[in-house]
Amino acid sequence: GFAWTMLCMNEIFYFIGALGPLFIVLALTGLELGVAILQAYVFTILICIYLNDAINLH
């Protein structure tokens, strides 16, 4: 509507408006990958702790 027409009137804003969603998607994908790596790290540490406790009974 009106906002898109105003963005298209200036080429600089059109360029930013065209690439803005791409950068947002890339940032969210990077954040998601970072969270996945952190979850894998925590899972590995917890597995090591649990296995250590299971093997070395006190």
UniProtKB/Swiss-Prot annotation:
Q: Which domain of life is it from?
A: Eukaryota
Query: What GO MF annotations does this protein's record show?
Result: proton-transporting ATP synthase activity, rotational mechanism
Explain the purpose of this protein.
Mitochondrial membrane ATP synthase (F(1)F(0) ATP synthase or Complex V) produces ATP from ADP in the presence of a proton gradient across the membrane which is generated by electron transport complexes of the respiratory chain. F-type ATPases consist of two structural domains, F(1) - containing the extramembraneous catalytic core and F(0) - containing the membrane proton channel, linked together by a central stalk and a peripheral stalk. During catalysis, ATP synthesis in the catalytic domain of F(1) is coupled via a rotary mechanism of the central stalk subunits to proton translocation.
Enumerate the transmembrane spans: 11-31, 35-55
Q: Record's family?
A: Belongs to the ATPase A chain family.
State its location(s).
Answer: Mitochondrion inner membrane
Q: How does it assemble?
A: F-type ATPases have 2 components, CF(1) - the catalytic core - and CF(0) - the membrane proton channel. CF(1) has five subunits: alpha(3), beta(3), gamma(1), delta(1), epsilon(1). CF(0) has three main subunits: a, b and c.
Keywords per UniProt: ATP synthesis, CF(0), Hydrogen ion transport, Ion transport, Membrane, Mitochondrion, Mitochondrion inner membrane, Transmembrane, Transmembrane helix, Transport
Q: Membrane topology type, per the record?
A: Multi-pass membrane protein
Q: Which PANTHER family match?
A: ATP SYNTHASE SUBUNIT A
Q: What is this protein called?
A: ATP synthase subunit a
One annotated Gene Ontology cellular component of this protein = mitochondrial inner membrane
